[in-house]
Design a protein with these regions (language model features):
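Short, conserved active-site loops that position catalytic residues or coordinate cofactors/metal ions
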Residues: 49-66, 97-104, 269-270, 311-326, ...
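Membrane-embedded alpha-helical bundles of multi-pass enzymes
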Residues: 20-253, 468-469, 483, 495-506, ...
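CN hydrolase (nitrilase-like) catalytic-core segments centered on the catalytic cysteine
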Residues: 159, 315, 322-323, 329-350, ...
Length: 567
């Protein structure tokens, strides 16, 4: 069916005195296979991911996807055929991008799923690539297939559609293209406290759409004046300059603000590789206790250097999966923690597991626990965001047969109960903090609601050792920087294997970044103070603004260029 879809050869009705491209070059570009554009788009989107240090390719990464879909729109055939082709092409883009960017998923399937490397990569490309491909289809293909191609007005409509959809579109792991592109551009990423990390796609998708406008003039021969191109470019650089200016002002305000309640943070990165543990749940309890004794010894050594100012409260942080037992079910280890806290006059923040119910009907929870310097438990938080196919089986209630098949064939597949409370712990009357666990931070509302509940510091307790030597830590750090800026709150990334780091309210590092699979300690004093964030308080209104702009520009575009084409 798809083999009979043909691309029309162009007719260039507009003749200019100074053409941008030769007729031969125009025809060659026009007839470039959409699958070639799909491959190029997938490569660029893969390079846009953390870990490659090429994230700025995101400025143009979506242009090949747009050109690919322009080819689809010009295909002969029914709407259904073009729809199917667009879905397959977007899946192809997502598959290539996923295989390049999600090595951490491939590594997990290979190591813990006991699958050959080629099969693991195929699962990443087909499975995770499908999620990325569907996202690209909704963001890019839907407006192209449903709107009549205009000369100008369909482009701002598509931009606002992208910005609106990206705020709410469901994902197993919530990430966004705008944040990925500008995650290490300090001046520009400060606008995330106005429009969110996803809103930064305004600058990357906006540039790609302007380049598409240039394509329409240079290759398709549309009668688009240089004045229109100039106005579009001026608008882009005006927004870019405003964003950079706002970022410079915000950074100077955050850096220059020295007041607040001091807290001395000691975060231990013990380098507990969990490969053996994760692939062997029956690992001897004695070895887990040995690890715990090593952790206590490392903590004692780290606490031997007191804060510069006396009387400053201390917080000792242990990452996820380094505590050897269920905290509330094992009195011996719980008492050891309380005793250590009292002896060293330090609060301790740790992650553990808990369960309730009857034998055969247990409900498990991942939890974080704060123990005060008096040895008393100050509170617990139940993990909200569960890792798909690691801590939960998505849609298991809808497909019970498939869920049971996965339980029988995937080693170490756990099923946890999600928490519902965005807990903020009280360390003192002046100090409140939160402790989201691992992938909790991929859901934007988690840290947002914790901060709105009074948290002045978010401590992310993570277990990433099972991802091995991959880019998992780079992905986590990028997302945590978005959350710090979006909510204007410091964030501590405490990982059991690296790369632990303390991130300030402006998204910049306040401590050295510890190495991957290296032992180390972060020991620093930070002053905590509540800060205002427009996006944190009015996120819903930002989303509504994108929708209103989309509808308004759609109405204008329809009046100017009949964009709805009979709809």
């Amino acid at each position: 069916m798809l083999e009979r879809i043909a691309i029309t050869v162009p007719i260039f009705p507009v003749k200019r005195n100074n053409p941008l491209l030769s007729e031969h070059m125009k025809i060659w570009l026009w007839n470039t296979s959409p699958w070639l554009w799909a491959a190029l788009g997938g490569i660029l989107i893969g390079l846009n991911a953390p870990g490659w240090h090429t994230q700025l390719v995101g400025l143009v990464a979506h242009l090949p996807v747009m050109l690919m879909l322009e080819q689809v729109r010009k295909c002969h055939g029914s709407f259904g055929k073009r729809l199917l082709l667009a879905i397959l092409l977007c899946w192809g883009v997502g598959g290539v991008g996923a295989m390049m960017s999600a090595h951490w998923i491939t590594n997990s399937a290979h190591v813990f799923g006991h699958l050959p490397w080629v099969v693991s990569m195929g699962i990443t490309g087909m499975g995770y690539g499908l999620e990325v491909g569907l996202l690209l289809f909704v963001l890019h293909a839907m407006p192209i297939l449903l709107l009549r191609s205009g000369r100008v007005w369909d482009l701002p409509v598509r931009l606002c559609w992208f910005l609106w959809v990206d705020t709410w579109y469901p994902r197993l792991i919530h990430w966004n293209f705008g944040g990925l592109t500008f995650t290490q551009v300090p001046l520009l990423e400060q606008v995330a406290d106005l429009i969110g990390a996803s809103g930064m796609a305004l600058f990357s998708i906006g540039l790609s759409l302007w380049l598409l406008l240039l394509w329409r003039r240079a290759v398709e021969g549309q009668d688009i004046s240089r004045r229109v191109l100039g106005v579009g470019l001026a608008c882009y650089f005006g927004l870019l300059g405003s964003g950079i200016g706002y970022g410079a002002w915000q950074q100077s305000d955050v850096v220059g603000h020295s007041s607040g309640t001091p807290l001395h943070i000691v975060s231990v990165q013990p380098n507990f590789s969990l490969r053996k543990l994760a692939s062997n749940p029956d690992l001897a309890y004695s070895e887990r206790i040995r690890n715990f004794k090593t952790l206590l010894a490392d903590s004692y050594h780290a606490l031997s250097q007191p804060p510069e100012s006396s009387g400053v409260p201390r917080l000792l942080v242990w990452p996820e999966s380094v505590f050897p037992a269920a905290f509330f079910k094992n009195p011996e280890t719980r008492q050891a923690v309380s005793r250590f806290a009292r002896e060293h006059q330090t609060a301790i923040l740790l992650a553990s597991v808990d369960w309730s119910g009857t034998p055969g009907n247990y409900r498990f929870q991942g939890i974080s626990v704060l123990v005060g310097p008096d040895g008393q438990v100050r509170g617990r938080y139940n993990k909200i965001f569960l890792i798909p196919f690691g801590e939960t089986i998505p849609l298991s209630d809808w497909f019970p047969g498939l869920a049971q098949l996965l339980r029988e064939n995937i080693h170490n597949l756990s099923e946890f109960e999600a928490g519902r409370e965005f807990t903020a712990f009280s360390l003192s009357e002046q100090l409140r903090l939160s402790a989201p666990i691992c992938f909790d931070i991929f859901a934007p509302d988690t840290i947002r609601n914790m901060t709105r509940n009074g948290s002045q510091l978010a401590v992310n307790l993570s277990n990433l050792a099972w991802f091995g030597q991959s880019t998992a830590s780079d992905n986590m750090e990028a997302v945590l920087r978005w959350r710090a800026i979006e909510n204007r709150t410091p964030v501590l990334f405490a990982s059991n294997n690296g790369r632990s780091v303390l991130i300030g309210a402006d998204g910049q590092s306040l401590s050295p970044r510890l190495g991957l699979f290296e032992e180390g300690v972060i020991s620093t004093t930070i002053k905590l103070t509540p800060r205002f964030s427009f996006y944190r308080e009015y996120q819903e209104w930002v989303n509504i603004t994108w929708l209103v702009l989309f509808l308004g520009l759609l109405w204008i575009g329809h009046r100017q260029e009949n964009l709805l084409n009979g709809w």
